[in-house]
Amino acid sequence: MIKLFILILFFQFIFMNENEQINKFIKNTNHQYKKIKDYEVDIYVKMEVPAFRMPKKKYKVYFMQPDLIKINSKGFGILPKTGLFTSPTDNFDNLSNIKIYSNSENNNHDEIILSGKIILDSLKIEMPNEYSRLTFIPTVDVQIDTINWVIKSVITRIDTLKLFEIYNKYKFINNKYYMPIESEIKYFLKDKKVANWLNKDINSVIGDTKINNKNNEMIEGNIFVRYDNYKINQGLSKSFFYKK
């Protein structure tokens, strides 16, 4: 009986220690994100999706903490929202049962992976029935650089089937701010629910654009995002974001 009690205490200690580590990783990553009070940047988007054509597009994007965004663009264009203008805390709040995994692929000790299940209510997807709600529970693997405390990649999957991937490249701007300079977003679609989710995650700047997958065929799409001409912590005012 005493051995069983000690064993239970041991596993409780491990569980509490892991939760403390997870909270530390999220807190440090969010702290790094919060150092950027506001910024202005030129964003270039190139989209490669079957049956959908859009020329390379340029946006002038303004951002101010916590969630003020202003986008200037001429003509039609789309801009993916996933992870671009949301804090790490907000993103991790959409996950449950978060666990820590080491990055065994490249044996890099300066990177860790936090993996969790998506909270379906956060997706705001209409499910046709309760069975779909129970079976459509994606897992998200978030790779964190523990030296610079930034998110390097996000992979969303159901078991081993990948739904979409985000990869970010960074460099120091003004020798001070570690900012993304390139993002690549890959979509793998073979389900109407997933296609609907993607459409929820695409922000139409002008017009109403939908990616259709009526035949449930596998669609692989790529969105390439490049960031240039950063102006960071200029002291933008809130009133600027409400001007038309």
What feature does the model see in each segment?
Residues 109-239:
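Gly/Pro-enriched, hydrophobic low-complexity segments
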Residues 40-43, 54-58, 66, 71-73, ...:
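Extended beta-sheet lipid-handling architectures
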Residues 50-113:
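An acidic-aromatic
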Residues 22-24, 90-104, 162-164, 222-225:
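A short, amphipathic edge element
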Residues 43-47, 65-67, 73-77, 116-120, ...:
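A mature extracytoplasmic/lumenal domain signature
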Residues 39, 95-98, 103, 154, ...:
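Generic beta-strand hydrophobic packing signal
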Residues 1-8:
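Sec-dependent signal peptide recognition
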Residues 11-51, 55, 105, 243:
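N-terminal leader/targeting segments and the immediate start of mature chains
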